[in-house]
Amino acid sequence: TRLVGSEMCIRDSAEIADDVKIGPFCVVGEHVKLGPGCVLHSHVVVEGPSSFGSGNEFFPFSVLGLKSQDLKYKGEPTYLEVGDNNVFRENATINRATDIGGTTRIGNNNLFLVSCHAGHDCQIGNHVIFSGFATAAGHVTVGDYAILAGCCAVHQFVSIGEHSMVGAMARVSQDVLPYTIVEGHPAVTRSVNSIGMQRRGFSEEDLRAVRMCYKKLFVNKKLTVHEALEELRNSDYAENACLKRIVKFVETSERGFCH
C-alpha cells in the first residue's frame, strides 16, 4: 500500500491490496476491504463492513459505508459491496443497508458525480451515471446504463430500468421503464431513449419494438395497461428481447410506472 500522506487513520482489521494508494487525511475503517488498484485521494472516508473491488477511485470528501440514514436502524450488522472500476467524485455518499444482514450493492464501471447519494439497500447495476446532486433513497434499484441527471430525486423502493434516463430535477415516485426518458415534478414518461439505445448498439428492430411499446402504453389513451400488454404480446415484435423486457417490467412493478 502506498501511503501518500502521513495524516490518516487505517484500522487494523482493514484489508488493503499492496498497490492501493491512500492520500492524506483519509479514514479506512474497521472491516473494509480495498482491492488492487484503488486510489483514495485526500479526505476520503470508507467504513465497514464493506468491500471494494479493483480499480475504484475515490475523490476528496467522498464517504462510503457509513450506517444507513434510517431511524429504525439500531446498529445491526449490514454491508456495502462495490465492484470494480467505479469513480466516486467529491462529496458522493453511499450508505450500508438497514435490515440485519442486508447489503447495499454497487456494480462495475459506474460514475457517481459531485454530491450525489445512494441510500441504504440500493442495488445499482453497471455503467450507471449519477450526475451531480442526484439522489436515490433507500431500496432503489437502478439498471445497467441508466443515467440519473442532476438534482433528480428518486423515492424509496423505485426501480429505474436499464438504458433509461431520468431528467434533471425530476421527482421520481414510480418505476421508470427500461429504454425510456422521464422528467418533471412529478416525473412522467416523455419519450423513448432512442439516442441512448443507438449509442449502445441496439438494432433498428429493437428501436421499433420499444417505440411500439411506448405508443401502446403512453400514447393510445383508449387502452388500459392490461389491454396494451395483451396487444404487445400478440404483436409482430412479440419475441423481441426489448419488448419482452418492458412487458415483464410492467407486470412485476410494485409501485406502478411513470405515465
Please place each PLM-identified region on the residue numbering:
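N-terminal segments that cap or nucleate solenoid repeat domains
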Residues: S6-E30
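Terminal amphipathic alpha-helical/low-complexity segments used for targeting or macromolecular assembly
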Residues: S6-E7, D18-D19, G55, F61, ...
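Single conserved hydrophobic/aromatic residue that forms the stacking wall/gate
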Residues: T1-G5, C9-I10, H120
